[in-house]
């Protein structure tokens, strides 16, 4: 099995980021809320809020598991809201000292892992309590949406280069 030399390209699509040749139309980006990235962020925020409300309204069996799930869902929701507002109001142009694609990538990696762990923990602690079961289901759904957003935002494509000089 021979493996040829290959070129790995990674691309980051920031949804509503304007290119250098496109005109700016003020502070608010009117196109961003219609992009796939923005719609994924809104869906993630809604599912995280529903998961938080379901677990918060249930009777706590294990206080540590409830607290962990609540903290993870609220921190994840707040960070997604911050990234949504950064793209909506184009703060990435003003705050150039922060690498926004890298910080969003790290947030999605760490946040999705913690959300998945919290959903597993709360699902294992749900002893026929419908609030905890619903919270765990929405936690898993939010984890899936975060993974899908991560996959669609940071695509990795492998392109094999040809070895002939005429190309």
Curated annotation (Swiss-Prot):
Membrane-spanning ranges: 35-55, 69-89, 102-122, 132-152
Keywords for this protein: Chemotaxis, Cytokine, Membrane, Transmembrane, Transmembrane helix
PROSITE patterns: MARVEL
Membrane topology classification: Multi-pass membrane protein
Residue ranges annotated for the MARVEL domain, each copy included: 32-158
Keyword Secreted: no
An example Gene Ontology CC term for this record: extracellular space
Principal location listed in the UniProt entry: membrane
MF terms (GO), sorted A to Z: cytokine activity
InterPro entries attached to this UniProt entry: Marvel, MARVEL-CKLF_proteins
Subcellular location: Membrane
Biological process according to GO: B-1a B cell differentiation; chemotaxis
Family from the record: Belongs to the chemokine-like factor family.
Name of this chain's protein: CKLF-like MARVEL transmembrane domain-containing protein 7
Organism in which the protein naturally occurs: Mus musculus
């Amino acid at each position: 099995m021979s493996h040829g030399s290959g070129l790995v390209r990674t691309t980051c699509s920031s949804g509503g980021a304007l290119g250098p040749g496109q005109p700016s139309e003020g502070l608010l980006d009117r196109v961003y809320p219609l992009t796939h990235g923005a719609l994924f962020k809104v869906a993630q925020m809604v599912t995280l809020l529903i998961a938080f409300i379901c677990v918060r309204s249930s009777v706590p069996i294990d206080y540590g598991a409830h607290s962990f799930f609540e903290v993870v869902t609220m921190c994840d929701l707040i960070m997604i809201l911050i990234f949504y507002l950064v793209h909506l109001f184009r703060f990435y142009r003003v705050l150039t000292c922060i690498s926004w694609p890298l910080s969003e990538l790290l947030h999605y990696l760490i946040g999705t892992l913690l959300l998945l762990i919290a959903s597993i923990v709360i699902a294992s602690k749900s002893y026929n309590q419908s609030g905890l079961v619903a919270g765990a289901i929405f936690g898993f759904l939010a984890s899936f949406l975060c993974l899908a957003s991560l996959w669609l935002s940071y695509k990795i494509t492998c392109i094999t280069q040809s070895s002939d000089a005429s190309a």
